[in-house]
């Protein structure tokens, strides 16, 4: 990150808040499924339902929050989302100690945290272009995504370790604490959160339609959202099968499972560093395609693993490195070509269309694992991931400099 951004106290506060929020989210990604599997004895199908419930708010609320961000103060929505997640996750250990924790309760928690996460993510993506100059977007995104990578290192490891020490329901309180830190940091940002648009507010439907039309009509945005949809559907299926593969097929303890998943983080941190320089050197299109081929191809190796934790860590590291490169490069493309007044709606549209199939993917992953076993489910999901680089290859985006 440039010295100018480090000297910007408000950016640093955003960075701290985003990092804490990501730590909470990453820890929760481990603790919620493992509460279902280890404490409540959830089946493969029930785990798929849990992940689908957590991701369903993307379909239900992403476009609404996108329009809201462009009309309201983005940072106000971020702190509300942090507060909501802190309260909801903090209720898990209370329910456990009272003896009322069950799968229906966990489904409600997953759905409510999912709503808050959608709100935070849309507002966060729209807040950076309001806080820094356009020529600082690449450096700002690199710093923020680097912190997300650090969260991917620490979050699963912390979550998995605490599950071993405290049991999964009690460990959920850690995610709640991270969201409290994020809430306090973002609240301290002093720069006025100026509304991104001066146009007449109109109706939400009209504003949502403007975001959809821009994405549909812009070649680069349209290509990114198609590739993202294919990727996210397949990745959701893969992660549902992967959690079952690690916990039941390989029978890894919680701490080891957290360590394996945490390997995504250092790879993603390296990917953040690469994405700050390589696209300018080789061109955005070429970097996106090569990185997508390497990252998605690496996941094809998962079904062949039988006992090597080191090999699992290596696969996750490679995937983390190159998938992060793809994510950051496509994010810079999106933020650069999108007018400031449409940042929230375009971010929400991309999330809605790109992540909207993840609930279905989670259900498919659980069904495949239940009927064909986790190894076959992993193979089919990994093959689905490879459709993403094929989409980039067949589009004009491959020539983008």
Task: Please give the residue ranges for each predicted region.
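Helix-loop boundary and gating motifs at the non-cytosolic
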Residues: 1-56, 213, 217-264
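Short helix-loop-helix connector
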Residues: 6, 24, 40, 69, ...
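Hydrophobic alpha-helical transmembrane segments
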Residues: 103-110, 114, 139-195, 256, ...
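Hydrophobic core of transmembrane alpha-helices in multi-pass small-molecule transporters
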Residues: 19, 101-119, 230, 310-325
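Residues that mark transmembrane-helix kinks and helix-interface sites
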Residues: 30, 118-126, 131, 240, ...
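C-terminal transmembrane bundle of multi-pass solute transporters/carriers
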Residues: 50, 59-63, 71, 75-78, ...
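Flexible cytoplasmic inter-helical loops of multi-pass small-molecule transporters
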Residues: 136, 187-213
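Structural signature of transmembrane alpha-helices in multi-pass secondary transporters
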Residues: 21-22, 54, 113, 144-152, ...
